[in-house]
């Protein structure tokens, strides 16, 4: 997911996305531990998506404190 797409979402939607990504990462790690994960690169992409969501949330928080 692109950062521009994330910036168009509301803060509540971003928090929902963050929770979804975290649960997906948990599931992927569990699959990796049990040897069922075929696409290990997916973990990397989910981690990056989590970072993007957190970055957008931090930008909004910073903007609110400055405004």
From Swiss-Prot:
GO-annotated cellular components: cytosolic large ribosomal subunit
Record has Ribonucleoprotein as a keyword: yes
Gene source species: Clostridioides difficile (strain 630)
Alphabetical list of SUPFAM superfamilies matching this protein: Ribosomal protein L29 (L29p) (SSF46561)
Family, similarity comment: Belongs to the universal ribosomal protein uL29 family.
Protein name: Large ribosomal subunit protein uL29
GO-annotated biological processes: translation
GO terms assigned for molecular function: structural constituent of ribosome
Protein keywords: Ribonucleoprotein, Ribosomal protein
InterPro entries: Ribosomal_protein_uL29, Ribosomal_uL29, Ribosomal_uL29_CS, Ribosomal_uL29_sf
